[in-house]
């Protein structure tokens, strides 16, 4: 799993590192991160989990991670800054129905700052499941995020971020070069009008300073570098 080292936000934003991007996810609403493997989607998710489990600023910093494909690597999560003692890991063994039921149950439980449903390539989530999860989280303080390879039309998600891989980064001189990391782009695929307040620039002092090289991209796009 890659680890974030820097973030370049859209023009007009304070360069507060990746925190500005992670601060977009609204509590009490369903959000999505979509993108294929090696696109930075999983690494972005780990960065968010790390922020919440180490800050303790929301709901005690407790996170529930529903792992549809049993793909989470605890060692990589710890290297990304996740406090494993604040993480509830639910392994679903590739069973979509089990994953959906677990997420529906956990999002109704008080005390979680974040509930993640990571489906990866498991399959499209039924429209009825989207609606049920949205109703379950609505009005509360929990952030609910689903991650999958593709976005499903008709999803009620308030925020949808799409990731795509740009290029690898190499280290050393030829012929002894080695892969140092990956570069990916994160873009706002959808933001519901009723929640545009979540897109305002973060205030000064909110970020922990994952340094960006410049204001790259345009509109709601970020360029992220991930170290391996």
Tell me the role of every PLM-derived stretch:
Residues 1-65, 79-85, 225-227:
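Detector for small/aliphatic-rich hydrophobic stretches
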